[in-house]
Regions:
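His/Asp/Glu-rich metal-coordinating catalytic cores
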Residues: 1-61, 66, 70, 75-236, ...
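Conserved acidic residues
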Residues: 58, 199, 364, 391, ...
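Short, surface-exposed amphipathic charged segments that create phosphate/polyanion-binding patches used
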Residues: 140-144, 297-306, 444-448, 508-521
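Hard-cation-handling environments
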Residues: 226-239, 244-407, 412, 416-419, ...
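Generic long, charged, amphipathic alpha-helical segments
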Residues: 408, 416-449
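C-terminal accessory regions
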Residues: 445, 452-459, 476
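Conserved phosphate-binding/catalytic loops in two-lobed NTP-binding clefts
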Residues: 485-507
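Heptad-repeat coiled-coil amphipathic alpha-helices that mediate oligomerization/assembly
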Residues: 519-533
Length: 533
């Protein structure tokens, strides 16, 4: 029997961790082991005892490098885990960077505990390909498929033998936005889908209740809006542009979009007589200490090639957009990391501030961490530029309640305003975050669940929804049921849609494993205590 218990991301969007136990081989393992983030109540969960014995786990299968999916790995090691963490090479390198940074910032674990993690890197094998089966134990195997969420991200399929054949379950990880039809964000190629004969699909629901506007899924409109805001700030108002950014993935996306502005938009802008001073050299700087190291990983792996000769991760449309070959993009990123400067042509140049170097207030455009504006280099730029209406802050990511970024978001507009309508002692704020979200919306999640890529074998699948707030989960469940009832041609058939909870499930039969009265009473007491705290 293979049984499953959801440990984290049951009530919210962080702390992803799922415990599986194959009883026939007595093999216990996890899919992800993430840190809870957000409110004090949510972060309180990080100090609570694991429901499993870390020393008895043989593996952790890691979907990607975000802290809410990998952040408790060092604690797992501290408590006796000596097994292997499976991941792609890019995910391993990014995870190590994220955990070392978290060790320095949070103090929840040590750098030594991060370095003690034992890795098994899937794509170091010369025979690696997406979807290839890898044995975990007698009668249990897994396969990794590509996600478009961030570099190295994957969905994971786990298969096992039962008395009448085989069963399988797929874990979505975080579902990205890129599809075969519309890979509109700059870096990642489209993600793959669960196998057509999958029996169970565990799917995230971060934006399960949200439908993104078509405008925000259009790369040309995103680039045009960014060009409008930058040109208005630099050449009409005569100010500076500040773009707060998360160090992992968002900073690298913005770097590509700013490079596009320099290479493609700026030459056209210079033909317009109303843009005074547009013939001067423009400088754009990336100032993110962790982002500097992350960019080095992107330089190594973004343009890597699979054994079939195709890009493993790179969105090929980026080459066309920038009029650069993949090796030129790779060389540009490497040059920024090593030498701190890249000539973007006649328009100007990109630069990257190395860790511990001072802020570059001379730059015209600055991409700075942290994304929510509460710490990091962005703080010094806000202090210097935040009181001048000639300057513009472009928000490109989620801002949690109570953060400095959320405060800025309260007065943000969707497009630049006339100078005389702005506050005389505050920088203008423009919200472009809907254009950059790396999470699939409801329609994309439905596509992820129902698409079978034309393959005929299509078992009815049970959907298990987690990693979302209650409203998102219930709205997604309703949408999945409605789509299933419509019986579209070539859609995956759906057997049942459930909201994931903390009870054990026998995946051989699909039945919930009921607790004994004593166990259930103890669980009820713990839940009541947790809610009071």
């Amino acid at each position: 029997m293979l049984k499953i218990k959801f440990v984290g991301a049951i009530e919210g969007v962080s702390g992803s961790c799922t415990w599986l136990h194959h009883t026939d081989s007595d093999t216990q393992f996890l899919v992800d082991c993430g840190m809870h983030q957000g409110t004090e109540r949510e972060e309180w969960a990080n100090s609570q005892a694991f429901p499993f014995q870390a020393a008895r786990l043989k593996y952790v299968l890691l979907t990607h490098a975000h802290i809410d999916h990998c952040g408790m790995l060092p604690r797992l090691v501290r408590e006796g885990f000596t097994g292997l963490v499976y991941a792609t090479r890019a995910t391993r390198e990014l995870t190590e960077l994220m955990l070392l940074d978290a060790a320095r910032v949070s103090g929840m674990f040590t750098e030594q505990e991060v370095k003690q993690i034992r890795w098994s890197v899937l794509d170091d094998d010369l025979g690696f390909k997406w979807g290839r089966s890898i044995r975990l134990a007698e009668g249990v195997w897994m396969a990794y498929l590509r996600s478009s969420h961030i570099l190295g991200a994957c969905l994971i399929s786990i298969g096992w033998k039962v008395h009448d054949g085989n069963r399988s379950i797929c874990f979505s990880g975080d579902v990205g936005c890129q599809t075969d039809e519309n890979a509109y964000l700059p870096l990642m190629k489209s993600g793959q889908h669960p196998f057509p004969d999958t029996d169970y699909i565990v799917v995230e629901s971060t934006y399960g209740s949200r439908i993104r506007a078509q405008e925000h899924q259009d790369s040309q409109l995103r680039l045009a809006r960014l060009a409008e805001v930058i040109a208005h700030t630099l050449f009409v108002k005569g100010g500076k542009v500040l773009m707060p950014a998360f160090s992992l993935h968002r900073a690298q996306e913005l770097l590509m979009d700013v490079l596009h502005w320099m290479k493609v938009s700026l030459p056209a802008i210079r033909q317009a007589p109303e843009h005074r001073g547009s013939d001067r050299l423009i400088t754009a700087n990336v100032h993110a200490p962790l982002g500097h190291a992350v960019t080095q990983v992107y330089a190594k792996h973004l343009c890597s090639i699979s054994p079939n000769g195709k890009f493993k991760y790179l969105n090929a449309e980026l080459c066309e957009s920038l009029t650069m070959q993949a090796d030129e993009i790779q060389a540009m990123l490497q040059r920024l990391v090593e030498h701190g400067r890249f000539n973007a042509g006649e328009g100007g140049y990109l630069s990257m501030t190395k860790p511990k170097q001072p802020s570059n207030f001379e730059a015209d455009i600055v991409i700075a961490s942290a994304g929510m504006c509460g710490n990091g280099p962005v703080v010094s730029y806000l202090e210097r530029w935040g009181s001048n209406p000639r300057n513009t802050v472009i928000l490109t990511g989620y801002q949690s309640a109570g953060s400095k970024g959320a405060e800025l978001m309260q007065r943000a507009t969707a497009s630049p305003a006339l100078m005389d309508s702005l506050s005389p002692d505050l920088a203008e704020v423009v919200d472009m975050s809907p254009y950059y979200s790396a999470h699939a919306d409801q329609q994309m999640l439905l596509g992820f669940l129902f698409r079978t890529d034309g393959f005929g074998c299509n078992k009815p699948a049970t959907i298990l929804i987690n990693h979302g707030n209650p409203a998102s989960k219930y709205e997604l469940r309703k949408a999945v049921q409605m789509r299933a009832d419509s019986r579209k041609e070539n859609d995956r058939q759906i057997k049942e849609v459930r909201i994931a909870d903390a009870r054990w499930i026998n995946l051989d039969s699909g039945e919930v494993i009921e607790q004994s009265p004593i166990e259930q009473a103890l669980l009820n007491e713990l839940e009541a205590l947790r809610r009071r705290l």
